[in-house]
Amino acid sequence: QDPAPAQVQAEPAAPAVGTVILRADYTGPALPENYTMDQISLGELQTVTPLLGHLRSDYGYRDHPVDGEYKFHNGVDIGGQEGDTIGAFADGTVDYIGKNDTHGLYLQLDHGNGIKSFYAHCSKLCVSKGQLVAAGEKVAEVGSTGVATGPHLHLELKWNGLHLDPAYYVEFLSA
């Protein structure tokens, strides 16, 4: 008697981009427009942690460390040393680069499917507008430009303009 043929199981596909994969149990103040505490699927996007460091400030409402005002923090702050490498969150194109009083030196990457990552307080930008970058490729260096209490990466993630909590998608060093 012949043995039964081996069963081949396909890898399950990632949920479609934009699918809610974790509904947050959030009971705090009303969120600003275009912000969510839910985890949203990024589909098949292959991602990396741009800077492995300690989480210095969460996404969400907080007392601002400089002005003391209670307001929403659009991203996460990841601690690092001045000049540490910041890698691209995923393959993408440099959407824009710039400098202002709040964010200091900053850049945004477009990863397609409405997914964008934003990096602020950099000491140096290592890319130019329109440049293609690979996941993990050096795009900037950690700094404390703009309104900052010390060297760190301020990282924001968006899907079709909806701000996401980056902590769902990156790793941190434990305390």
Language-model regions: role of each:
Residues 105-113, 131-175:
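Conserved, short, structured surface segments that act as functional micro-motifs
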Residues 71-74, 88-126, 151, 156:
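Zn2+-dependent peptidoglycan hydrolase active-site motif and core
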Residues 1-10:
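Terminal presequence/propeptide segments associated with secretion/organelle targeting
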